Amino acid sequence: MLALVKLALRITTDKYDERIQQLIDAAKLDLKIAGVVLPATLDELCEQAIITYCMINFLGLSDDEFDRLQKSYDLQKGQLRSATGYTDWGDQT
């Protein structure tokens, strides 16, 4: 996951690996708090949400870019929360 996020952020140095890993972990926690159960092997939807979260919190963005990416992340998180296989709400019957 670290390599994918670094590629998306266009980071080629290892200098920021610790910070980027913290953001990856924070993204996973944010999704978990929202009720998303991440699969053991992350799929493309989960990876993209994590990448977007990292972009929001790592890059120095303009207000417009920040708002655009935040909306994108919120939509991605919402889709995961409502999709079958990404939540564990238990038996609702």
Regions found by a protein language model. Give the residues of each.
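Conserved short "hinge" loops at termini or chain/domain junctions
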Residues: 1-49, 56-57, 61, 68, ...
